[in-house]
Amino acid sequence: MYKRQWYSQKIRGEKIYENKTPSEIKKVFRLEEKNKQCKPEDVLSHLDKNLLKYSNFNPSPNYYGYITGSGNQIGVIGEFLKSALNQNNLKWHSAPANTEIEKICIDWISKFIGYYNKKNAGVFVSGGSVANLMNIAIIRKIKGHDSINKDGIYGNKTMRIYVSKESHSSIDKAMDILGLGINNLVKIEVDDEFKLQPKLLREKIREDLN
């Protein structure tokens, strides 16, 4: 009940973080090393006193202008269940309920964006940056030579990825991580509505093919 009251009061407040320096925050959490074991309740008490105080309060309506979502109270229950069950979506038998829920949600999203067909498949990942990395890795696998998984990209024709000039920086990083090279990421100009211009895209592809 106490935490619920704290949450309700905090979400109505204006302050979303403590204006402290890195050294000040570090000092709070640098517990003295002891030879004896630390009781779990002591650790929880310390976190209760300090972790909540010195963490950014993302659920606040005053927290905006950055990439993280606000979260919500029902999400706390979801995170609790996820940690308690500790499922591994390695294969169906290791996480049957999670696997079917994931497939259903992917179907929902596919229908929502108008990209649905019975053969649709996919997985949920931690966020957009990892999704971009995975997508480009899949493209590399499909478009690369047959032995790319064994011999790597050496001897393969240069691959290029075309994106809008407003694309996320994670795509640049993915090109670097996957060995495709940032110089092979071609960024196409956008119009006044920040939309990629198909005409310029076609022209650039023709230019590269020639």
Residue ranges of model-derived segments:
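N-terminal entrance/gating region of PLP-dependent enzymes' catalytic architecture
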Residues: 1-119
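PLP-dependent aspartate aminotransferase-fold enzymes
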Residues: 68-82, 89-209
